[in-house]
Protein backbone atom coordinates (compact mmCIF):
# COMPACT_ATOMS: atom_id res chain seq x y z
CA UNK A 1 0.00 0.00 0.00
CA UNK A 2 1.36 3.42 -0.95
CA UNK A 3 1.22 6.63 1.03
CA UNK A 4 -0.77 9.73 0.10
CA UNK A 5 0.53 13.29 0.00
CA UNK A 6 -1.29 16.60 -0.34
CA UNK A 7 0.14 20.12 -0.21
CA UNK A 8 -2.43 22.66 0.96
CA UNK A 9 -2.80 26.17 -0.42
CA UNK A 10 -1.01 27.65 2.60
CA UNK A 11 2.05 25.44 1.99
CA UNK A 12 1.36 22.83 4.67
CA UNK A 13 2.10 19.22 3.66
CA UNK A 14 -0.19 16.35 4.68
CA UNK A 15 1.06 12.76 4.40
CA UNK A 16 -0.84 9.63 5.37
CA UNK A 17 -0.30 5.89 5.29
CA UNK A 18 -3.63 4.08 5.70
CA UNK A 19 -3.49 0.81 7.63
CA UNK A 20 -7.08 -0.51 7.74
CA UNK A 21 -6.08 -3.65 9.63
CA UNK A 22 -5.36 -1.71 12.85
CA UNK A 23 -7.60 0.28 15.20
CA UNK A 24 -5.14 3.01 16.10
CA UNK A 25 -3.53 6.09 14.59
CA UNK A 26 -0.08 7.63 15.05
CA UNK A 27 -0.07 11.35 14.30
CA UNK A 28 2.89 13.71 14.14
CA UNK A 29 3.41 17.41 13.50
CA UNK A 30 6.90 17.72 12.05
CA UNK A 31 8.39 21.21 11.96
CA UNK A 32 11.46 21.76 9.82
CA UNK A 33 13.52 23.40 12.54
CA UNK A 34 16.21 21.84 14.70
CA UNK A 35 19.20 22.94 16.69
CA UNK A 36 21.25 23.22 13.48
CA UNK A 37 19.07 26.23 12.54
CA UNK A 38 20.02 28.21 15.65
CA UNK A 39 22.44 31.11 15.72
CA UNK A 40 24.85 31.79 18.56
CA UNK A 41 22.16 33.65 20.52
CA UNK A 42 19.58 30.89 20.13
CA UNK A 43 21.46 27.86 21.49
CA UNK A 44 18.84 25.51 22.90
CA UNK A 45 15.90 27.72 21.94
CA UNK A 46 14.43 25.12 19.55
CA UNK A 47 14.23 22.60 22.38
CA UNK A 48 12.98 25.24 24.81
CA UNK A 49 10.16 26.08 22.40
CA UNK A 50 9.17 22.41 22.33
CA UNK A 51 8.67 22.57 26.09
CA UNK A 52 6.72 25.82 25.88
CA UNK A 53 4.12 24.35 23.52
CA UNK A 54 2.79 22.30 26.44
CA UNK A 55 2.54 25.26 28.84
CA UNK A 56 -0.80 26.68 27.78
CA UNK A 57 -2.77 28.54 25.13
CA UNK A 58 -5.12 31.53 25.32
CA UNK A 59 -7.96 29.22 26.41
CA UNK A 60 -6.26 26.24 28.07
CA UNK A 61 -3.66 25.73 30.76
CA UNK A 62 -1.04 22.96 30.79
CA UNK A 63 -3.25 20.74 32.96
CA UNK A 64 -6.13 21.14 30.48
CA UNK A 65 -3.87 19.97 27.66
CA UNK A 66 -2.68 16.95 29.61
CA UNK A 67 -6.20 15.99 30.71
CA UNK A 68 -7.48 16.30 27.14
CA UNK A 69 -5.09 13.62 25.91
CA UNK A 70 -5.60 11.51 29.03
CA UNK A 71 -9.35 11.42 28.37
CA UNK A 72 -8.60 10.16 24.85
CA UNK A 73 -6.43 7.39 26.27
CA UNK A 74 -3.68 8.81 24.10
CA UNK A 75 0.07 8.84 24.38
CA UNK A 76 1.44 12.27 23.53
CA UNK A 77 4.87 13.85 23.66
CA UNK A 78 7.44 15.76 21.61
CA UNK A 79 11.12 15.73 20.80
CA UNK A 80 13.74 17.98 19.26
CA UNK A 81 16.65 16.88 17.10
CA UNK A 82 19.32 18.70 15.18
CA UNK A 83 17.14 18.62 12.04
CA UNK A 84 13.50 18.92 13.14
CA UNK A 85 10.98 19.19 15.97
CA UNK A 86 8.08 16.75 16.33
CA UNK A 87 4.87 16.80 18.36
CA UNK A 88 3.07 13.47 18.29
CA UNK A 89 0.18 11.45 19.67
CA UNK A 90 -0.98 7.84 19.44
CA UNK A 91 -4.65 7.00 20.02
CA UNK A 92 -7.59 4.84 18.92
CA UNK A 93 -8.77 5.64 15.41
CA UNK A 94 -12.05 7.38 16.30
CA UNK A 95 -10.18 10.09 18.26
CA UNK A 96 -8.32 11.59 15.29
CA UNK A 97 -10.15 14.92 15.28
CA UNK A 98 -9.91 15.31 19.06
CA UNK A 99 -6.15 14.72 19.04
CA UNK A 100 -5.44 16.82 15.95
CA UNK A 101 -7.43 19.79 17.22
CA UNK A 102 -5.47 19.94 20.47
CA UNK A 103 -2.07 19.56 18.80
CA UNK A 104 -3.05 22.35 16.41
CA UNK A 105 -4.08 24.65 19.26
CA UNK A 106 -0.82 23.96 21.08
CA UNK A 107 1.47 24.90 18.20
CA UNK A 108 -0.63 27.80 16.90
CA UNK A 109 -1.91 29.50 20.06
CA UNK A 110 0.76 29.04 22.74
CA UNK A 111 0.98 32.19 24.85
CA UNK A 112 4.58 32.05 26.16
CA UNK A 113 3.79 33.78 29.44
CA UNK A 114 6.77 34.95 31.44
CA UNK A 115 5.63 32.85 34.39
CA UNK A 116 5.65 29.70 32.23
CA UNK A 117 9.02 30.63 30.74
CA UNK A 118 10.57 31.07 34.19
CA UNK A 119 9.14 27.76 35.37
CA UNK A 120 10.20 25.81 32.31
CA UNK A 121 13.64 27.39 32.36
CA UNK A 122 14.37 25.51 35.59
CA UNK A 123 13.02 22.29 34.11
CA UNK A 124 15.33 22.54 31.09
CA UNK A 125 18.36 23.47 33.21
CA UNK A 126 17.72 20.36 35.29
CA UNK A 127 17.44 18.34 32.07
CA UNK A 128 20.83 19.69 31.00
CA UNK A 129 22.29 18.65 34.37
CA UNK A 130 20.90 15.12 34.00
CA UNK A 131 22.34 14.85 30.51
CA UNK A 132 25.76 15.95 31.71
CA UNK A 133 25.59 13.33 34.45
CA UNK A 134 24.67 10.54 32.01
CA UNK A 135 27.81 9.01 30.45
CA UNK A 136 26.10 7.90 27.22
CA UNK A 137 24.67 11.37 26.62
CA UNK A 138 27.86 13.17 27.58
CA UNK A 139 30.06 11.08 25.28
CA UNK A 140 27.67 11.78 22.41
CA UNK A 141 27.93 15.54 23.02
CA UNK A 142 31.73 15.32 23.25
CA UNK A 143 31.77 13.51 19.93
CA UNK A 144 29.65 16.18 18.25
CA UNK A 145 31.60 19.12 19.66
CA UNK A 146 34.91 17.51 18.66
CA UNK A 147 33.74 16.55 15.18
CA UNK A 148 31.98 19.84 14.35
CA UNK A 149 33.79 22.54 16.36
CA UNK A 150 32.36 26.07 16.25
CA UNK A 151 29.28 24.90 14.35
CA UNK A 152 25.59 24.45 15.33
CA UNK A 153 25.88 20.71 14.64
CA UNK A 154 28.49 20.52 17.37
CA UNK A 155 26.31 22.16 20.01
CA UNK A 156 23.95 20.25 22.32
CA UNK A 157 20.28 20.24 21.36
CA UNK A 158 19.43 21.15 24.96
CA UNK A 159 21.56 24.29 24.81
CA UNK A 160 23.53 25.64 27.76
CA UNK A 161 22.54 26.91 31.18
CA UNK A 162 23.81 30.36 30.26
CA UNK A 163 21.69 30.71 27.12
CA UNK A 164 18.58 29.04 28.52
CA UNK A 165 18.77 31.47 31.42
CA UNK A 166 18.32 34.46 29.09
CA UNK A 167 15.23 33.54 27.06
CA UNK A 168 12.30 35.95 27.15
CA UNK A 169 8.74 36.17 25.88
CA UNK A 170 9.96 38.13 22.85
CA UNK A 171 12.55 35.46 22.02
CA UNK A 172 9.82 32.81 21.95
CA UNK A 173 7.42 34.93 19.90
CA UNK A 174 10.08 35.82 17.32
CA UNK A 175 11.23 32.21 16.99
CA UNK A 176 7.63 31.05 16.60
CA UNK A 177 6.99 33.59 13.85
CA UNK A 178 10.13 32.55 11.98
CA UNK A 179 9.74 28.78 12.06
CA UNK A 180 6.21 27.78 13.10
CA UNK A 181 4.33 28.43 9.87
CA UNK A 182 2.53 26.25 7.34
CA UNK A 183 5.38 25.98 4.85
CA UNK A 184 7.62 24.55 7.55
CA UNK A 185 5.15 21.90 8.72
CA UNK A 186 4.39 18.33 7.68
CA UNK A 187 1.37 16.65 9.29
CA UNK A 188 1.93 12.90 8.98
CA UNK A 189 -0.32 10.08 10.14
CA UNK A 190 -0.45 6.31 9.85
CA UNK A 191 -3.17 3.92 10.92
CA UNK A 192 -6.85 3.34 10.34
CA UNK A 193 -7.70 6.62 8.64
CA UNK A 194 -8.89 8.13 5.38
CA UNK A 195 -6.53 10.55 3.66
CA UNK A 196 -9.23 12.88 2.37
CA UNK A 197 -10.74 13.15 5.84
CA UNK A 198 -7.31 13.90 7.31
CA UNK A 199 -6.78 16.66 4.74
CA UNK A 200 -10.17 18.17 5.61
CA UNK A 201 -9.40 18.14 9.33
CA UNK A 202 -5.98 19.70 8.80
CA UNK A 203 -7.58 22.39 6.65
CA UNK A 204 -10.11 23.08 9.39
CA UNK A 205 -7.76 23.22 12.36
CA UNK A 206 -4.68 24.77 10.77
CA UNK A 207 -6.46 27.54 8.89
CA UNK A 208 -5.13 30.06 11.45
CA UNK A 209 -1.52 28.97 10.94
CA UNK A 210 0.15 31.60 8.83
CA UNK A 211 1.07 30.67 5.27
CA UNK A 212 4.63 30.46 4.07
CA UNK A 213 7.28 28.57 2.21
CA UNK A 214 9.96 26.49 3.87
CA UNK A 215 12.23 28.69 5.95
CA UNK A 216 15.60 28.81 4.24
CA UNK A 217 18.14 27.05 6.40
CA UNK A 218 21.20 28.98 7.49
CA UNK A 219 23.51 26.32 6.18
CA UNK A 220 27.25 26.52 6.62
CA UNK A 221 29.82 23.84 5.94
CA UNK A 222 31.24 22.53 9.23
CA UNK A 223 34.99 22.23 9.59
CA UNK A 224 35.32 18.49 10.15
CA UNK A 225 37.91 17.66 12.80
CA UNK A 226 39.24 14.13 12.34
CA UNK A 227 41.48 12.26 14.74
CA UNK A 228 41.32 11.06 18.33
CA UNK A 229 39.97 13.39 21.01
CA UNK A 230 39.88 12.53 24.69
CA UNK A 231 38.51 14.19 27.79
CA UNK A 232 38.79 13.37 31.48
CA UNK A 233 35.90 14.65 33.56
CA UNK A 234 36.34 14.71 37.32
CA UNK A 235 33.20 14.36 39.38
CA UNK A 236 32.61 13.56 43.02
CA UNK A 237 33.25 11.05 44.46
CA UNK A 238 35.34 9.42 41.73
CA UNK A 239 36.67 10.39 38.29
CA UNK A 240 35.14 9.05 35.12
CA UNK A 241 36.75 8.85 31.71
CA UNK A 242 34.91 9.92 28.58
CA UNK A 243 36.33 9.64 25.09
CA UNK A 244 35.11 10.50 21.63
CA UNK A 245 36.91 9.60 18.46
Task: Say what each PLM segment does.
Residues 183-189:
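Short loop-to-beta-strand entry elements in the cores of soluble alpha/beta enzymes
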Amino acid sequence: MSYFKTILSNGLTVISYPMPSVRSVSLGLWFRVGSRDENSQQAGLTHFMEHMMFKGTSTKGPLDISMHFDKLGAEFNAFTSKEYTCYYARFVDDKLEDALSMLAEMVIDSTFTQEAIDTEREVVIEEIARSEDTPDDYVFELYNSSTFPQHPLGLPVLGTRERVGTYTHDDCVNFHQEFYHAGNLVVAAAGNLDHDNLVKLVNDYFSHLKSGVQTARKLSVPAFSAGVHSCLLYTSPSPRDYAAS
